[in-house]
Amino acid sequence: LATLSGQSLRVGFWNVENLFDLKDDPTTRDEEFALGGKKNVTQDIYDLKLKNCAAVLADLNADVLGLCEVENYFVLDELNRAYDGRDYKIIHYDSPDQRGIDNALLYDPEVFNVIATKPILNTLPEGGPTRDILYVQGEYKGHTLHIYVNHWPSNYGGKKKAIPKRRATARLLANEIAEKLSNDPDAEILL
């Protein structure tokens, strides 16, 4: 994203593919990633995932980075400590997703100023919860940006089941954006 002065904001999005801690959270279905779970994750495997993710962060070198498929704030903090390129600030909310999968945003406070954040609750047509859409309003070089970090319901369980869920999520996001644009037709929005 470039300003009129030519200065750019480096923005990215990354699916970190199930960045989970090793503890079994009894309130979610995360046990396959816990120690002793079906995925056979060990401390060494977890540490290697953090190391590899930190290397990707270095390659991306983003000022603002949306992430999906993170379990909680703890793993984001661990990732931030494994990466020594920047001291990112973390925006994360625990969502009601049954598997404990959340969205998050990392940002460099030296470059991007956060004004407001909120999770947008995403209730599916059959009433079941899924991960929230993360909304972040921030400022860069005098420009107000509206960022929506989202990871729509997966095709896990088949496309026939997934399509109505994904459509509902698309409608929710479209309504949020329409409301933002009705208040400010020139709003700068990133998805």
Set out the residue ranges of the language-model regions.
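Intrinsic structural disorder
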Residues: 1, 15, 161-165
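Short coil-to-helix leader/linker segments, especially the first N-terminal amphipathic alpha-helix
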Residues: 1-2, 129
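N-terminal, active-site-proximal structural segment of metallo-dependent hydrolase catalytic domains
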Residues: 2-101, 170-175
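Beta-sheet entry/capping signal
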Residues: 8-10, 63-64, 144-146, 188-190
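Metal-dependent phosphoester/phosphodiester hydrolase catalytic core
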Residues: 25, 140-183
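Structured beta-strand-rich core segments of catalytic domains in phosphoester-bond hydrolases
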Residues: 64, 70-144, 148, 152-153
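Metal-dependent active-site segment of extracytoplasmic phospho-/sulfohydrolases and closely related
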Residues: 181-191
